[in-house]
């Protein structure tokens, strides 16, 4: 009798875990839908890490494209090519970034990564869902995403990369109608910048 009770309890725990995992995926799916707004979205952010310190900036996103601006650099990504203007050096580096590179630069890149071999878990904290993603042999080993329950807007993203945690806090999230031209570097706007092609 005790063995049967233990087995039933074990099955119920497994089922509860599966249902909880489905809920985490549903929350991430809804969040991806919000962030992937057809016209685009804009937000402010603060990035904190022991390795790089703190950086504030703004980001505009439309599909896989993004444009980020901080005091140190401006980044354009058109879905394939990335241009990074380093303000201090007046130079533009051009490359085709990897998924891990994009995650380090675009905090919302998780909306494409979470379906690729990550295990989910979820808890709640006040008016937020807290979704944890863990993956083996990934550039980003773990992500903890805090998502507002009513709006499904991500308000904080923590990433574990190379044994270092980076925290990204997001504010002023809003939908927008963004032109594709803002996601490409315009050399006319930076006539004196040195362009270094790393592709």
PLM ranges: what are they?
Residues 1-9:
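Bacterial N-terminal signal peptides that target proteins for export
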């Amino acid at each position: 009798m005790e063995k049967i009770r233990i087995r039933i309890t074990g099955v119920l725990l497994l089922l509860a875990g599966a249902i909880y995992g489905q809920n985490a995926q549903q929350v991430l799916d809804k969040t991806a839908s919000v962030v992937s707004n057809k016209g685009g979205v804009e937000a402010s952010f603060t990035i904190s890490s022991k390795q790089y310190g703190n950086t504030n900036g703004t980001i505009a996103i439309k599909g896989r494209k993004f444009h980020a601006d901080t005091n140190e650099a401006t980044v354009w990504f058109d879905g394939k090519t990335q241009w990074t203007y380093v303000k201090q050096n007046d130079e533009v580096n051009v490359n085709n970034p990897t998924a891990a590179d994009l995650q380090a630069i675009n905090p919302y890149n998780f909306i494409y990564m979470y379906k690729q071999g990550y295990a989910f878990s979820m808890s709640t904290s006040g008016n937020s869902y807290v979704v944890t993603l863990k993956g083996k042999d990934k550039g980003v080993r773990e992500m903890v995403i805090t998502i507002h329950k009513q709006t499904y807007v991500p308000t904080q993203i923590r990433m574990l990369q190379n044994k270092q945690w980076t925290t990204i806090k997001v504010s002023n999230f809003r939908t927008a109608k963004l032109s594709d031209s803002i996601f490409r570097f315009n050399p006319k706007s930076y006539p004196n910048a040195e362009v270094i092609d790393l592709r």
